[in-house]
């Protein structure tokens, strides 16, 4: 990638598969497949609530009586709605329509997004300057040392949103480093928004740079903004049909079973009061001791990113002076703002899963700074990330 974000995109072909690429792709497929099989064996097969909602959608309504009394459900005059985004439901529709693989759909859907996201980590690393074996190390970190693996194998519609967003943001960043077609960039951000609305904030810095660098600025802005506008309108309609307001996502009025989450929500769904606890979960939360085997356990609300994915620290190697690095840092920071203002934190998780909203930008920074690697320290951090 050219260090100047305003420079014209390169027409030079970047991605040519070689033996190492194929072996990496095969390794990802095997690891993710085996991990999913273990998850299925350990958790057994259950019908996901998102699959139930998909069946209701095919019947012409958004509510489902079976949702009553479950977490993140909204009761509107005796009709029960699941307070999740549209892209957490839509992939279930084919399974609901054909009535096949009930209970397995959630695992297969997560893999369908998670595996390609892991595969694309390699071209992402190369697009932002990683060369030779270093690109494979970075790709291995993304595939096995980030929370992408965790979110891809447990068959959970909450985690699915992160896989969807991670994949589309990865494609977005690769496209930005290459041809920078406004319609493609806008489409990727639009899809990411439908999965994780927080990620739409990345459109601000990238959109400004795109418009600034183009002679056809108005046309570029329209091509970038149209798919984003359609996605926002669709999400608003989706909320209005369920809750009577395009701005009501349901999380402010949904049913909660955990008193601590209810107490946090009382402070505001988005509030500065949430920042200290979210920072603690994201950066400082440590394993807790047990008096018996395995002697350590983790807080179900989160675990420090510095323990789970310490290789993200190498994003600092990119520095802050390079204009490309500045753009990526700004995007990551903007996306992180609502993450740390939000009350939820992400219950029943390993690590701090909301960090996946801005992780793709940090991965690009890791690759951008890879020319400054010493060697073993960075590989050690990646090894710890994978092992954790």
Where do the protein language model's features map onto the residues?
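Membrane-proximal envelope and lipid/glycan-remodeling enzymes
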Residues: 1-388
